[in-house]
Every structure is written in structure tokens, then in C-alpha cells.
From Swiss-Prot:
The keyword Methyltransferase applies. GO terms for molecular function: rRNA (uridine-2'-O-)-methyltransferase activity. Pfam families: FtsJ (PF01728). This is Ribosomal RNA large subunit methyltransferase E. Specifically methylates the uridine in position 2552 of 23S rRNA at the 2'-O position of the ribose in the fully assembled 50S ribosomal subunit. The keyword Hydrolase does not apply. S-adenosyl-L-methionine binds at residues 91, 93, 116, 132, 156. GO terms for cellular component: cytoplasm.
């Protein structure tokens, strides 16, 4: 989750950087006390057109463009919908959700509730909660803030990477499973669940559960997702409804 400017939502934009972006590459010298990994990260940020475009448009992170692109393809967010955003900080996805569902409208608008384990700044049009989603009280806090069923549950949660692909894959699948369990409790029939996974997709048991509860399950890697990143997203639409 890259950080960017902290302006509020309220703009319309396309799904990618403006055509006038500079084709210049910035090289960063490694300071004596700066690790090579930090230098490479800084250089990548400086040369990333999505980072520049996020700042220009007032999005808190480049991740906003991932949500915009997923929404353009799958039509996830619509006016009046109620959305839960898990792993929301610093708020890029939340900003897009606020815009798309019209959460700032005094009448007829949607509702957006976000939660992250990290502290994050309040966002106009959204209820921003700080807390560990794995904590026992987290689901109830989200349900109370939402005040009713959700139409969309988004999860951009990710565990710290270890550098060991199999371990990282299992960790993020665990987060997806917990997010899915919550989604099955709060989604209204016809609802949508979107979650970050790593390449290799979902485990068979998780995929079977998704297919059992949703009419359509697809994987997608939006253009704004870094080419070198192993992340991809599972998009499950058409929630069949609770079996209880």
C-alpha cells in the first residue's frame, strides 16, 4: 500500500496515468545509511506514473487505480451501494468507493466503511475504523458501523512478506478465508466479494467455497498492479445468499 497525498475524494478520472506523463527515469543514489532495498523502493516510486497521477488527482495511494480498473471491468461499485473495505489504509480504495457509490450525497447515496490495523486519517464520506480485522470484536464493529447488510466486501489485506513464496501464499490465503467468512455473513443476495491473492490464485478448497456461494468467480490482475508483483485479485459476483 503505497502512500501518497491526503486530499479528499471528489474527482472523476480515467483508469491510468495521463498521456502527458514524462518518460523520464529518475535514479537515486544510495546514501550511506540507506539500505539498497530502500533506495530501490524510492527509485521505483519516483519513476512510477501511477504514483504521480495519484498525487495529481488527490488519491491517497496508487492502489486507487487498481480499484478503478477492476470496477471498469467488473462493474463492482454502483450508486447507492453499501461497501466494506478491509485493509483500507491509507484509503485509496475507500476514496474510489466513496466516489462510485455517491457516499457524499445527502440523499440516495451509498455507504462506505473501512478498517485497517494501521492508523489512518479520516476520509470524507466514509467511516474509517482502526483495528485488527482478526480481533474478535472486529466483525461486530464493522457491522455496527455499516448498520445493515453490505452489497460489496473488498479486501486488500496482505500479511508481511517473508520472501518464501509458499509461506506468503498461505498467509494471504488465510486472510482471504477470514474476509470471505465475514462477507458470507454480511453480503446481501447478489453481492460482490473482491480480495487480493498471490499468483497461483486461490486454494482449491477456497475456490470451491467461492463457487458454491457466488454465481461467477474470476481472477484479474489490473494494469496498475506492478509487473513484478505476485499479487492478483479474485472477484466473486452474484452472492447466492446465506444458507442459514
Amino acid at each position: 500500500m503505497a502512500t501518497g497525498g491526503k486530499k479528499s475524494a471528489g474527482r472523476t478520472t480515467g483508469s491510468g496515468p495521463a498521456g502527458g506523463s514524462r518518460n523520464l527515469t529518475v535514479k537515486v543514489k544510495t546514501a550511506k545509511r540507506r539500505k539498497l532495498s530502500s533506495t530501490l523502493w524510492l527509485q521505483r516510486q519516483l519513476n512510477d506514473p501511477y504514483v504521480h497521477e495519484a498525487k495529481r488527482l488527490g488519491y491517497r495511494s496508487r492502489a486507487a487505480f487498481k480499484m478503478i480498473q477492476l470496477d471498469e471491468r467488473f462493474h463492482i461499485l454502483k450508486p447507492g451501494l453499501r461497501v466494506v473495505d478491509l485493509g483500507a489504509a491509507p484509503g485509496g480504495w475507500t476514496q474510489v468507493a466513496v466516489e462510485k457509490v455517491g457516499a457524499l450525497k445527502p440523499k440516495g447515496g451509498g455507504k462506505v466503511v473501512g478498517m485497517d490495523i494501521l492508523e489512518w486519517d479520516p476520509l470524507p464520506g466514509a467511516i474509517t475504523l482502526q483495528g485488527d480485522f482478526l480481533a474478535d470484536d472486529a466483525p461486530d464493529r464493522l457491522k455496527e458501523a455499516l448498520g445493515g447488510p453490505a452489497d460489496v466486501v473488498l479486501s486488500d489485506m496482505a500479511a508481511p512478506t517473508t520472501g518464501h513464496p509458499s509461506t506468503d501464499h498461505l498467509r494471504i490465503i488465510g486472510l482471504v478465508e477470514v474476509a470471505l467468512h465475514f462477507a458470507l455473513e454480511v453480503l446481501t443476495p447478489g453481492g460482490t466479494f473482491v480480495a487480493k491473492v498471490f499468483q497461483g490464485g486461490t486454494e482449491k478448497t477456497l475456490l470451491d467455497q467461492l463457487k458454491k456461494n457466488f454465481t461467477t468467480v474470476r481472477h484479474a490482475k489490473p494494469p496498475a498492479s506492478r509487473q513484478g508483483s505476485a499479487e492478483t485479485y479474485v472477484v466473486a459476483t452474484g452472492f447466492r445468499g446465506s444458507s442459514e
